[in-house]
UniProtKB/Swiss-Prot annotation:
The gene is rsmB. Belongs to the class I-like SAM-binding methyltransferase superfamily. RsmB/NOP family. It is an enzyme of class 2 (transferase). It comes from Vibrio parahaemolyticus serotype O3:K6 (strain RIMD 2210633). PANTHER family: NOL1_NOP2_SUN FAMILY PROTEIN _ ANTITERMINATION NUSB DOMAIN-CONTAINING PROTEIN, NOP2 YEAST -RELATED NOL1/NOP2/FMU SUN DOMAIN-CONTAINING. Its EC number is 2.1.1.176. GO terms for cellular component: cytosol. GO terms for molecular function: RNA binding; rRNA (cytosine-C5-)-methyltransferase activity. This is Ribosomal RNA small subunit methyltransferase B. The lineage of its organism: Bacteria, Pseudomonadati, Pseudomonadota, Gammaproteobacteria, Vibrionales.
Length: 427
């Protein structure tokens, strides 16, 4: 399939139909040549990063909007504008290939319109680009509700957060400690001429200077290494799992943190629970590649009595469902799929899971509450409320007035993440 047509289809599914990019893009990649996978991904990710700017330009160039069945051609225009504005593809190729996309999208009558719009943009690009950043949505590439939330929560840092959200995320690796030390794996990468640097805090994390195909990584197929952001790897620093313990990874899919616990312990029994059976397949796949064993359970974390009849856990990692506002650079569709009222609904869900999971923790046990969100309502305020209503909960390693640690996007080149460590006091 024509790459530009495939990209337009992805944007249509995400923006108009509410599909996630993580589901729409892999399906579209199956329709294009393998050598075009990276190009398709770049166009889709980039167009979603700068969607308001592209929309403003497209609307300025058209007399009337494309509606109904023609909406996919509106997104084809966005694909063309993105290439001309942000990519190093020669203009004639960007326009020509985008116009060719009308054939496979079954819209040959719109060929002339799309060609005219893109040529018009070429002629007036400087003026149109200036117009497109004249308001905050176009300038910062975020919906107004999210921009206001960030400005209110982080008055000194919101611009750096927004900038980080619009950058390409680096590729972080997690070395499997059961096979190699991090220094040993750094040497293996050096032997393959893959430039990399270790993280200062996440003990198994390595950042690649440039992303690469995982099959080019030494021993990837043997389970020597996994791909995981350094911020997510810090869960092990806070959980501090010990050999021989009974440990629960709650809301575990796709299983990176489950695997990390197993890689760092010996003789532990790890239970991984998630309510999404489809996503749990990823947990099984990851554990199989890494040759690790865990008890994988499909169940609702709010009702542990339905899926767990065993003893209480020594440690629980509660990686709560959240707005994912800390990982926008990896999932730019989040900006357009989330709504302002989602935050309160997610906070309520987190609260219910928090309370239910606390009953499963042994006295003297440790719970790490974690999200990949940066909203106070899901993080600091959530933990404060839990501590206020839970008599046997004690916060560790942080100030009760500002509980936990909030990592912001781009900090040490990491994703945005939140961690709070609590212990259950003994009677």
């Amino acid at each position: 399939m024509n790459v530009r047509a495939a990209a337009a289809n992805v944007l249509y599914l995400v923006v108009d139909k509410g599909h996630s990019l993580s589901s729409a893009l892999p399906a579209a990649q199956q329709t294009v040549r393998p050598r075009d996978h990276a190009l398709l991904q770049e166009i889709c990710y980039g167009a979603l990063r700068y969607l308001p700017r592209l929309e403003m330009i497209a609307n300025q160039l058209m007399d009337k909007p494309l509606k109904g069945k023609q909406r996919v051609f509106h997104h084809l225009i966005l694909v063309g504008i993105y290439q001309l504005s942000f990519m190093r593809i020669p203009a004639h190729a960007a326009v020509g290939e985008t116009v060719e996309g009308t054939k496979e999208l079954k819209g040959p009558r719109l060929r002339g319109l799309i060609n005219a719009v893109l040529r018009n943009y070429q002629r007036n690009q400087e003026e149109l680009d200036q117009m497109a950043v004249s308001n905050n949505a176009g300038k910062y590439g975020h919906p107004s509700w999210l921009l206001k939330l960030l400005q209110d929560a982080y008055p000194q840092q919101w611009e750096s957060i927004v900038d980080a959200n619009n950058q390409k995320a680096p590729m972080w690796l997690r070395v499997n400690h059961q096979h190699h030390t991090r220094d040993e794996y750094l040497a293996l990468l050096k032997n393959e001429n893959i430039d990399s640097t270790p993280h200062t805090e996440a003990m198994d994390a390595i950042k690649l200077a440039a992303p690469c195909d995982v099959m080019k990584l030494p021993g990837f197929d043997k389970g020597w290494v996994s791909v995981q952001d350094a911020a997510a790897q810090l869960s092990i620093n806070y959980l501090k799992p010990q050999d021989g313990e009974l440990i629960l990874d709650c809301c575990a899919a796709p299983g990176g943190k489950t695997a990390h616990i197993l890689e760092r312990t010996s003789g532990s029994e790890v239970v991984a629970i998630d309510c999404d059976d489809t996503r749990l397949k990823r947990v099984h796949e990851n554990l199989k590649r890494l040759n690790l064993q865990a008890k994988v359970v499909c169940g609702d974390a709010r009702n542990p009595q339905e899926w767990w009849q065993g003893e209480q856990f020594d440690r629980i990692l509660l990686d709560a469902p959240c707005s994912a506002t800390g990982v926008i650079r990896r999932h730019p569709d989040i900006k357009w799929l989330r709504r302002a009222d989602d935050i309160a609904a997610l906070a309520e869900l987190q609260s219910e899971i928090f309370d239910a999971m606390w009953t499963q923790l042994k006295p003297g046990g440790t719970m790490v509450y974690a999200t990949c969100s940066i909203t106070p309502q899901e993080n600091v305020e959530q933990v404060k409320a839990f501590l206020a209503r839970t008599a046997d909960a004690q916060l560790l390693d942080s100030d009760p007035d500002q509980p936990g640690r909030q990592i912001l996007p781009g900090e040490e080149d990491m994703d945005g993440f939140y961690y709070a460590v609590l212990t259950k006091t003994r009677a």
